[in-house]
């Protein structure tokens, strides 16, 4: 599991309770994990985190661009992400006359938002364990190369049904040192527009020096908006597109927090060594 993977995971952090720290796939939250979360202060039904039939948090957390995490915060397609995640798009939109990287940018209306060509936002549709399917032809005598070829071949067979829709992206991802295989399906939106970015003096304050320090003092955020067609489906850029209405958006609280409050993060981490043995 050292390789890059993009699948929605939950990170639980509770001050002073080290044994409860860790990262889990949302669909693998079991009764024990759910019970412990409630003991620590989680107050919602567990299916409010991940559901394939009802709106849930997984519908608000997105893959932004090539692998960053973003979150939907409004019923009009607003996405919050990091400044460094939007950096390339902001750079491409900048010019000598309008240096948005240096000076920042704020849109006052839908019409002023800037289309970010090539930028995508992907919403998770479903996750499915297909281990039994892709390993069904394996033999104990298979070499590692033969094993990989068989699994890859059946993975491609399984993904065939998604190839006709260019706005769906499906991929098979191995987990737990290739002992589990999941197919994850995303709806990919290709009309994404810049709404707000702070100047780099704020968004990139401290650079890489401060990047590994805590607390940090950088305003590392930017705001984009996802647009959809008139049927609220994914589409290429068009002036006729309208702000996307997500299945679920996360309310922003101004109440702050107090010591020992329950805390968790949902997103797309780059990698994890959870459950990795000392043998690697």
Model-derived features: where do they sit?
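Terminal presequence/propeptide segments associated with secretion/organelle targeting
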Residues: 8, 16-280
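Positively charged n-region of N-terminal signal peptides that target proteins for export
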Residues: 1-4
């Amino acid at each position: 599991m050292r390789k890059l993977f993009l699948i929605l995971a939950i990170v639980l952090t509770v001050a002073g309770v080290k044994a409860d720290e860790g990262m889990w796939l949302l669909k693998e939250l079991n009764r024990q994990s759910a019970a412990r979360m409630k003991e620590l202060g989680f107050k919602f039904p567990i299916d409010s985190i991940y559901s394939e039939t009802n709106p849930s948090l997984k519908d608000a957390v997105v893959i932004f661009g090539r692998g960053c995490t973003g979150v939907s915060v409004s019923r009009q397609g607003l996405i919050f992400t990091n400044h460094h995640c939007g950096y390339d798009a902001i750079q491409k939109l900048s010019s000598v006359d309008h240096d948005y990287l240096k000076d920042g940018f704020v849109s006052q209306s839908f019409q002023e938002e800037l289309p970010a060509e090539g930028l995508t936002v992907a919403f998770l549709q479903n996750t499915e364990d297909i281990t039994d399917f892709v390993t069904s032809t394996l033999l104990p005598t298979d070499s590692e190369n033969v094993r990989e070829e068989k699994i890859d071949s059946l993975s491609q067979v399984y993904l065939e049904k998604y190839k006709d829709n260019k706005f769906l992206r499906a991929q098979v991802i191995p987990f737990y040192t290739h002992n589990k295989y999941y197919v994850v399906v995303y709806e990919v939106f290709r009309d994404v527009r810049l709404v707000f970015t702070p100047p780099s003096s704020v968004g990139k304050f401290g650079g890489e020096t401060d990047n590994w320090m805590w607390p940090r003092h950088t305003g590392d955020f930017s705001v984009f908006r996802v647009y959809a067609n008139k049927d609220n489906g994914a589409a290429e850029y068009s002036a006729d597109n309208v702000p996307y209405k997500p299945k679920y958006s996360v309310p922003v609280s101004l109440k702050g927090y107090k010591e020992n409050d329950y805390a968790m993060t949902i997103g797309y981490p780059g990698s994890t060594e959870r459950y990795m043995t000392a043998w690697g």
